[in-house]
Amino acid sequence: MDAPLTDAERTALQTSLEALNRQVEATRNILRSNSQKALLQTLHTDQELPDPALEALAGKTINLLHETQQLLEPGHLVLADHFLGYVSTKCLCAAVELKLVDILADADEAGMTVDELADASGAHPDRLQQVLRVLRNDNIFDYDAVSHRYRNNRVSALLHSEHWTQWHNWVDLYGNEFYDIARGIPRSIRREEARWAAQINFDTNDDMFTYFQAQGWLPRLHRTLGGGAIAQAPGIVADYPWHEIGSRTVLDVGGGGGGFLASLLREYPQMRGGILDLPRTIEHACTLFHEPQGPYFDLRERVPRENLIAGDFLKAVPAFEIYTMKWVLHDWKDPDVLTILRCIRASLIPGPDSRLVILESNLSDGQMGRLSRYGDINMMMTANGQERSEEQWRALAAASGWEVSRIYPMRRAWVCAIDLRPSASESGDRKHS
């Protein structure tokens, strides 16, 4: 047992905490003031990207505050947030299912009382009050303690059924089906267990996509992931120097239906594109780009049919100067990732701008890195996959003839752009072979 604090140590700790409280309170009051609201809104507007310097500074502040919280918070509360964490998830599910955000959006500026919300949504007033108390303390919904009225705030507004980001679909799918999948995590990490969490929970040997299709859930999955891609596209398009590619053709390896490629080509009208994917997926992509009713029909001349290529990127990749891969490699373990990277490296057309841009999470610690850790566990439990850290990406690149030129953070996106260029040693070896 540690020795008790001396009077001097206790006084020093008390003085430090009092000074910290004064500083945090003063900073909070400044951020709440009318003079700072416009500045703060630049970080939180959902219609444009935040200022990159301010976002980075705010992220550093959040990490520091969280580290400070970890030093001060009682251990039993930390544990409670984990074994009672289901409460927050399911309260948010309830709010989405009842369409509380839509109801409040149609109300006047004064907002609505719990009784009014309950009448409009068909809820028990007392139970709704309990759910809203949890959510408002997590900064979801605004609450006036004097009038006892609720309004939407910048967080809850993201869940409106017509919001362009469609985050409400994530609450529905991940708060229910994926929530159930997580039950399989404890058993899945045992050494004797071969199946991953999704297979254990649903008692199947099918992969997630096959099982979801059999259950009729696949449209919800595509709708959710598609909405997430749209929500993250502005940062992905803005925060990497895509202009360097000019009028060259980008081959999106594992590019699916072409949503990412389309967003890139619409922003850079000189660029051309192509997709390499499985035959069934390419058939679907052809309809999207080359049928008059397809959403990417306007890009048909820049994505000709011959650039929609059916194949297997574990075996061979067509020769191009520029490749991209978005949310593909986290499905695979390291041996397969090395095979894929080597296939692309072997086919790369040499040039001063030749590259492979990988759009994946950069697994990291700290409060602002938590989405990468959530993603890592989701990949583990649904696909036996993983997210990777910068160190892991650099090691994989070095072992497959590449080097990491730079990693670009991307605003409002869960991915970074990991810019791979052919390694100097590999290029030299090829010249002398």
Curated annotation (Swiss-Prot):
One of its GO terms (molecular function) is O-methyltransferase activity. Signal peptide: none annotated. Belongs to the class I-like SAM-binding methyltransferase superfamily. Cation-independent O-methyltransferase family. COMT subfamily. The keyword Cell membrane does not apply. Residues 5-37 form a coiled coil. The keyword Transferase applies. This is O-methyltransferase aclM. Keywords: Coiled coil, Methyltransferase, S-adenosyl-L-methionine, Transferase. O-methyltransferase; part of the gene cluster that mediates the biosynthesis of aspirochlorine (or antibiotic A30641), an unusual halogenated spiro compound with distinctive antifungal properties due to selective inhibition of protein biosynthesis, and which is also active against bacteria, viruses, and murine tumor cells. The non-ribosomal peptide synthetase (NRPS) aclP is responsible the formation of the diketopiperazine (DKP) core from the condensation of 2 phenylalanine residues. Gene3D superfamilies: Vaccinia Virus protein VP39, Winged helix-like DNA-binding domain superfamily/Winged helix DNA-binding domain. Pathway: Mycotoxin biosynthesis. S-adenosyl-L-methionine binds at D277, G311, D312, F313. The active site is at H330 (proton acceptor). Its EC number is 2.1.1.-. Pfam families: Dimerisation (PF08100), Methyltransf_2 (PF00891). It comes from Aspergillus oryzae (strain ATCC 42149 / RIB 40). GO terms for biological process: methylation; secondary metabolite biosynthetic process.
